[in-house]
Amino acid sequence: MNTRDTLDTQLNVLESFNPIVPEGFKDCKYLMLGNLMPSIQQKVLDQLPTRPKLVVLDTMNFWMDHFWDDLMIALKGVDVLTINDEEARQLSEEYSLVKAAQKIMTMGPKYLIIKKGEHGALLFHEDKVFSAPALPLAEVFDPTGAGDTFAGGFIGFLAKTDDISFENMKRAVIWGSAMASFTVEKFGTERIAELTTEEINLRLEEFKNLMSVDIQLV
């Protein structure tokens, strides 16, 4: 379930959608631009009188195929781009994810998150790389929405802690990964809707154990 085939995309109402940001949200410090047409994402950002502390953008291969120029404009105004490995290779025309990341970060984003499904995620910033594991699950019911959940967990943690250092972004990636690991366990938002704080903490502990190792240097 690490790849997908887009058989058909119908924009329907989104093709002429004009987003209006409510006054109460125009002073937000953290902005997540969901996976919509790049021109719509840009319209949201343009309505904010003061640039947020952090702007995160999600996109996909369809926008790269059909709205490349608009996407290039949108990327210039964001801090973090989150995409999967297939999309990173398409966007950069590089197979190596390290080379892809370096090329994509010249397009505007200061940070890049490359999601690799069951193989975890990579966080890039300048010459720094953080590799986050995925939690091995015995059963995956439905991966739909896992990427959105990841993004929500990621920026939600950063907004809560109000710290956008690289070290804290590493923690945010783990938070996003943990939340996404719940989403795939049931259909839609069913699993997320029933989560308890205890379950989240236990899942985060599982991720900590995956990354913990005591090794002796030669």
Regions found by a protein language model. Name each.
Residues 11-16, 59-65:
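Short gly/ser/thr-rich secondary-structure transition/capping motifs
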Residues 97-218:
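Conserved phosphate-binding/catalytic region of the ribokinase-like
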Residues 32-37, 84:
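Catalytic beta/alpha-barrel core
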Residues 21, 71, 140:
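Acidic, amphipathic alpha-helical patches
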Residues 46-54, 63-131:
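Conserved phosphate/ATP/ADP-binding segment of small-molecule kinases
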